[in-house]
Amino acid sequence: MSLMSNFFEKSDVSRKEAESIISDTLQKCDDGELYLENSKSESILLDDNKIKNSSYNSDLGFGFRAISDEVVAYSHSNEISKNSLKQSSENLKSTLKSVKGTYNHEIPKSNKKYYDNINPIEQKSLNEKIKILNDVNDYLRSKGDKVKQVTANFLGEQKSVEIIRSGGETLSDVRPLVRFNVSVMVEKDGRKETGVYGVGGRQSYDSYLKLSLIHI
């Protein structure tokens, strides 16, 4: 099942209508596109033996760009609707009204997939992630009374992007991103030292957790 966002699913504008607005806006331009982005992120922080923070954010929006000769016009909105697209279209046309160009459909392009089509945020439940953080905290504190402070956190993100060019040509991508960090402070005879470990990248949490827990 694809995790690519359907940017028009909850909008009053259909994909066909959006493509029509894009083609109409760019017909006298050299180049341009509608760039759609849906970003979801989470952060879970354990500190001082308890979960100090847990947050989730979701952002949706678009950028509309038109290029004619040496002039670049750009408009953006965090609302994907018929009105916002039409307003952006009018803004671009107004900026480029005295400049004429010819849309280039032959610009080299690629839609190569670099990352797995996954949403790391949904691969584990919130309770599972909290349990892992608590287990890490318990394990490190079990190493002795010298361990005075343990901080551990998860950071996860999934970003879906789609680019629509004149004529309905579409390029899309899904970009996962995760991070797992641990910080430990130890104290002996009044001397404090801190060690930090972190790992992450554009894969799932599980891709890093097994290796991380072995190192810890």
Model regions and ranges:
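Short, solvent-exposed aromatic-acidic interface loops
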Residues: 78-80, 197-205
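N-terminal alpha-helical targeting/anchoring segments
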Residues: 42-97
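Generic structural motif
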Residues: 39, 69, 80, 157-159, ...
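Acidic low-complexity segments
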Residues: 2-23, 29-43, 83-173, 205-213
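Broad gene-expression machinery/nucleic-acid interaction feature
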Residues: 31, 43, 59-63, 72, ...
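Short, compositionally biased low-complexity segments
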Residues: 1-3, 61-64, 101-115, 186-198
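Short beta-strand elements
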Residues: 55-68, 171-200
